[in-house]
Amino acid sequence: MFKLLSVTSRTLCKEDFLARVGTICAAGIDGIILREKDLSEPEYQSLAINVLQICREKGTPCALHTYVTAAKSLHAEALHLPLHAFLALGEKEKRAFPTIGVSCHSLVDVVAAQEGGCSYVTLGHIFATDCKKGLPGRGLAFLSEVCRHASVPVYAIGGINRDNIARVRDAGVSGACIMSGLMTCRDPAEYLEELRHAL
């Protein structure tokens, strides 16, 4: 089943961020990655307590991002890391999390993450996006090539919308990560329905 994941960016959100997370969960998103890297670890942990509670109430899987100590203290089941941080994790730390995702930007990255024992990877950015201003997307041929060699689920990220999501799916990914669209849209339920209808 093709999954849709929400990668958060509270600075893009015009309404109360926690309310938006709740709305996205209620709309049936397949998972949330709480990516708020500008926060200090104590600030992130404080936010994560509330987000994890919302996700648990809605039955939505939630991965905490970057801050390993906070994730361990909150008994998070899923952790998402940049590749360099994942490779620096000890085996005992890895075992603390049933699911660990890794952000990758090349086939070499994906191979390294796989060899390190990750659960899944995100791969991007696939299309040009305001989140990576001035940088061209890596494209669908790149995505297809990586998917052919990957032995773990690959989730595409970067500029994915209803106009291109079917082509992303056809490249062989397990799902897509949506950031700005779900943070800024008027109605997350309607937005997700449009994405699923396009598949």
Task: Label the model's feature ranges.
Residues 1-18, 98-104:
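Active-site mouth loops of central-metabolism enzymes
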Residues 6, 83-93, 122-134, 162-198:
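Glycine-rich phosphate-binding active-site loops on the catalytic face of alpha/beta enzymes
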Residues 7-11, 37, 67, 84, ...:
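Active-site beta-loop-alpha junctions enriched in small/polar residues
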Residues 16-31, 74, 84, 107-124, ...:
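Alpha/beta enzyme core
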Residues 30-39:
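A short beta-strand-loop structural module common to alpha/beta enzyme folds
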Residues 33, 63, 80, 101, ...:
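Conserved beta-strand positions in the central sheet of alpha/beta enzyme cores
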Residues 44-66, 83-86, 91-106, 134-162, ...:
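Alpha-helix-loop-beta-strand connector modules within alpha/beta enzyme cores
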Residues 62-77, 105-117, 149-156, 160-178, ...:
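Catalytic cores of alpha/beta
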